[in-house]
């Protein structure tokens, strides 16, 4: 739906160029249902991850700090999801006021940037820990990790400011309903292009290239170590995991990014056909479901590969309190890529297998 704005009242009155685009009865049922499932699984899962990492693992590793913040970022988004489920179920009628319109929209944007930035930092941390285990010890400290997370939250907040400023409620005259959307001046294309392309570039393309490069270099390093030892009985799970992480990230986010770019073209009136607009508006909520279902699974995807996490997760389920005496043993095996190869395998850098630990 492409809005045209007509007055300067408290609640702006708009005219939608393609009023029926994206408005299908099955969307009003399917999307809220999926949102509800994501909300339940995400709140439950990410809350458990936060409790296990903070209370049982005690933030003893750099990776644990990134994973904790990743779970917190997802929780920030998830608490706004019931609003979007209700909004869709009510056929895009927004009854929650202008303030919640801004905050809920900012929550989506904030989670996008915070999660992607944290995943990028986690991939860089894995690269440093595995490829440069000795040189990176000085840089990979708990203090640096905490400062990095603070910077990421600030950057995500700054990136979300345009959403807070320009997202408002409007009354769509030809739809006879109040909607939550962006207001674009007809002659100002900078904001339209900027918001869309920043999501494409900063929220996907650049982080993905960094993640892909990091895990590719990790894969080459581990492969070289195996080739030197000629160990035919090696375990290739680490290679499969690296490939899975990259492809899972890419294929979960690429649909939403493509349709975001098409939406920019619609806002710029490069695409004016209402049939194409209907396709974009119809597909957009489903691409959001795919993207954020991936985000909610990220903590599980990374953490459940850690041996210690499974133990503490079971303790939490059985209401067994954390054992303080076990804390010193938690400095390793935190993240999904903290990998310890067989003892007879050494990296070409002449470091022992212990250099694969997460510290």
Swiss-Prot record:
Compartments in which it is found: Cell membrane
Matching SMART domains: 7TM_GPCR_Srsx (SM01381)
InterPro entries hit by this protein: ATII_AT1_rcpt, ATII_rcpt, CCR1-9-like, GPCR_Rhodpsn, GPCR_Rhodpsn_7TM
Topological domain spans for side Extracellular: 1-25, 90-98, 166-190, 269-278
Tissues expressing this chain: Adrenal medulla.
GO terms of biological process kind: calcium-mediated signaling; immune response; maintenance of blood vessel diameter homeostasis by renin-angiotensin; neutrophil chemotaxis; positive regulation of cytosolic calcium ion concentration; regulation of vasoconstriction
Regions of this protein lying in the Cytoplasmic compartment: 56-61, 126-141, 217-239, 305-359
Membrane topology label: Multi-pass membrane protein
Glycan-carrying positions: 4, 176, 187-188
Residues at which angiotensin II binds: 17, 167, 182, 184, 199
Gene Ontology, cellular component aspect: external side of plasma membrane
GO molecular function, one term: C-C chemokine receptor activity
UniProt xrefs under Pfam families: 7tm_1 (PF00001)
Transmembrane intervals: 26-55, 62-89, 99-125, 142-165, 191-216, 240-268, 279-304
Disulfide bonds: 18-274, 101-180
PTM entry text: C-terminal Ser or Thr residues may be phosphorylated.
Keywords linked to the UniProt accession: Cell membrane, Disulfide bond, G-protein coupled receptor, Glycoprotein, Membrane, Receptor, Transducer, Transmembrane, Transmembrane helix
Main function: Receptor for angiotensin II, a vasoconstricting peptide, which acts as a key regulator of blood pressure and sodium retention by the kidney. The activated receptor in turn couples to G-alpha proteins G(q) (GNAQ, GNA11, GNA14 or GNA15) and thus activates phospholipase C and increases the cytosolic Ca(2+) concentrations, which in turn triggers cellular responses such as stimulation of protein kinase C.
Family note: Belongs to the G-protein coupled receptor 1 family.
Protein name per Swiss-Prot or TrEMBL: Type-1 angiotensin II receptor
Organism encoding this protein: Meleagris gallopavo
Annotated gene: AGTR1
């Amino acid at each position: 739906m492409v809005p045209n704005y007509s007055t300067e009242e408290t609640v702006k009155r708009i005219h939608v160029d393609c009023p029926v685009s994206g408005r299908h009865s099955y969307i009003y049922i399917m999307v809220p249902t999926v949102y509800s499932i994501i909300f339940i699984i995400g709140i439950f899962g990410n809350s458990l991850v936060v409790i296990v990492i903070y209370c049982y693992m005690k933030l003893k590793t750099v990776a644990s700090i990134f994973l904790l913040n990743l779970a917190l970022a997802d929780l920030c988004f998830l608490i706004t999801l019931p609003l979007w489920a209700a909004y869709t179920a009510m056929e895009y009628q927004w009854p929650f006021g202008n303030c919640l319109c801004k905050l809920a929209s900012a929550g989506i944007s904030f989670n996008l940037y915070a999660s992607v930035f944290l995943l990028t930092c986690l991939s860089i941390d894995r690269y440093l820990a595995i490829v440069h285990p000795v040189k990176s010890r000085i840089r990979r400290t708990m203090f640096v990790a905490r400062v990095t997370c603070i910077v990421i939250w600030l950057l995500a907040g700054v990136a979300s400011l345009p959403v807070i400023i320009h997202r408002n409620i409007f009354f769509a005259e030809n739809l006879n309903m109040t909607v939550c959307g962006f207001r674009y001046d007809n002659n100002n294309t900078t904001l339209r292009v900027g918001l869309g392309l920043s999501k494409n570039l900063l929220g996907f393309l650049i982080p993905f290239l960094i993640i892909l490069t990091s895990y590719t270099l990790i894969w080459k390093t581990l492969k070289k170590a195996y080739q030197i030892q000629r160990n035919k009985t090696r375990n290739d799970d680490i290679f499969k995991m690296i490939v899975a992480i990259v492809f899972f990230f890419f294929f979960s986010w690429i649909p939403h990014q493509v349709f975001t770019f098409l939406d920019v073209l619609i806002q710029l009136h490069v695409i004016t056909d209402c049939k194409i607009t209907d396709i974009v508006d119809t597909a957009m909520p489903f691409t959001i479901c795919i993207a954020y279902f991936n985000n909610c699974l990220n903590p599980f995807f990374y953490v459940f590969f850690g041996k210690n996490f499974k133990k503490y997760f079971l303790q939490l389920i059985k209401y067994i309190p954390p054992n303080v005496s076990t804390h010193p043993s938690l400095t390793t095996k935190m993240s999904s890529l903290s990998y310890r190869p067989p003892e007879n395998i050494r990296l070409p850098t002449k470091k022992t297998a212990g250099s694969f630990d997460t510290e």
